[in-house]
Amino acid sequence: RLREQYRDQIEVRIGVELGLRPHLAEYYSRFVPKYPFDMVIGSVHSVHGVDPASEKLFEGKTDAQVYRMTFEESLEDIRHFHDFDVMGHLDYVVRYGKNKEKEYSYKMFADEIDALLRELIEHGKGLELNMAGLKYGLPFAHPHPDILKRYRELGGEIVTVGADGHRPEHIAW
């Protein structure tokens, strides 16, 4: 209805963000084709079944250990499901680390990140440049600029920009 109502003023598009998990791949394979989505973002919102925003994920681990686990699990998630357009906020787990970006750089996790990027590129997937990292006090958006550069070096071509706006005041943040 909105597309029709505002067709002379703006182009209304429909998208969805899916929390990728291997056990949901079959369900998503049936869900996505049922709707006329213009954009499907595939994101990782849990690591070993725990939300990265939860302190529980970091208990007894260094930030670097959690970041590595997240990249490894993200790779497994995208290997099980390919019916999305871009991967959302690839390194957003850094927002929640005890030391944030102090235990994080592309070079520290190059093997894991490169494997992820190659998998995305092989299947024609893009990356979302998610501005929320800045909103959460990081000196960069997600993913880190070095990851975007590496994505391009490996042949990646698709980058979208998002605000991670869960509330109206966060749109176009």
Predicted stretch roles:
Residues 1-122:
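Extended substrate/RNA-proximal surfaces in nucleic-acid metabolism proteins
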Residues 48, 100-173:
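Charged catalytic cores and adjacent phosphate/nucleic-acid-binding surfaces used
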